Swiss-Prot record:
Pfam families (UniProt xref): Glycos_trans_3N (PF02885), Glycos_transf_3 (PF00591)
GO MF annotations, alphabetized: anthranilate phosphoribosyltransferase activity; magnesium ion binding
Binding site for anthranilate 1: G81, N112
Official protein name in the record: Anthranilate phosphoribosyltransferase
Gene source species: Teredinibacter turnerae (strain ATCC 39867 / T7901)
Pathway where this protein functions: Amino-acid biosynthesis; L-tryptophan biosynthesis; L-tryptophan from chorismate: step 2/5
EC numbers, comma separated: 2.4.2.18
High-level lineage: Bacteria, Pseudomonadati, Pseudomonadota, Gammaproteobacteria, Cellvibrionales
Cofactor(s) this protein cannot do without: Mg(2+)
Amino acid sequence: MNIQQALARVVAGNDLSQDEMVEVMTAVMSGQATPAQIGGFLVALRMKSESLDEITGAAMVMRELATKVEVSANNLVDTCGTGGDGANLFNVSTAAAFVVAAAGGHVAKHGNRSVSSSTGSADVLEAAGVNLSAAPDVVARAIENVGVGFMFAPAHHSAMKHAIGPRKELALRTIFNMLGPMTNPAGVKRQVIGVFTPALCRPMAEVLGRLGSEHVMIVCSDDGLDELSIAAPSHVAELKNGVVTEFKVDPADYGFGYSDLDGLSVTSAEESLGLIRGAFKGDTTELSQKAAAIIAINAGAAIYVAGLAGSMKDGVAMAEDALSSGLAAEKLKELIEFTNV
């Protein structure tokens, strides 16, 4: 099936099969489709709403074409989000990665520069001094030795270059927002993924189940964050042992009062880094305490998913210890040094 045939099908409101989506995405990723065709296809998919087969097929192609990072550590975990929630919060999932590493985990962090928000994970790590151009073998050794490594998406998904122009010009959420978190180059099978709408929680968990994931939490807060919130309950779809279960996570159950999010939105990578460093240093200001709380609840989920804790509640307690001990700050320092040797 070529992209013109696929476009006609999707515009008519019909879903593509998984195999058909594999064909079309292969054409897109190999430069066989024009920018106009790619843009039209992305918009048509969005308007129809992407099916499980379509998302699965597209993810399979991206995974196949990715430049892999081979890591020997067990129970790798990733903390990431689709973006697009419009909240412009500081980089919570990026900060959480260092907390998980400090708690004894191995985090294969996958991310990019910002497309729609003020700062992406790559932007804030670059501002901190992490070398985004580190070779795959350096990233692998960082994950194994430091406990966290960063995989800059464009360096590992070079075939994506054909879709970059249409994505930027459209400036809309597309299937690629979902695919990024599902195409980790290290092949992680354990993840906490934030999404921009609760409607995506179950579908993404089911797709990851099809793709072989072991333990995943897909989260979206009731106040619209692609993170677990400290200001409202969050909707969660958890994939574990091949079964998807949906439930709410209430911050009050983890010792967090319903704190507002005032001051946690940022306009630059430097501002985001400032909030992260404040939380990592244990600053006692209200703002740093709020930042630490939202980092802890998200890191706690990842610590649990990574198999380091028997429950999310235990994971949150471990995250708080990693923050208060200064170990999370040390992990950030170690990654900066490791990638700049």
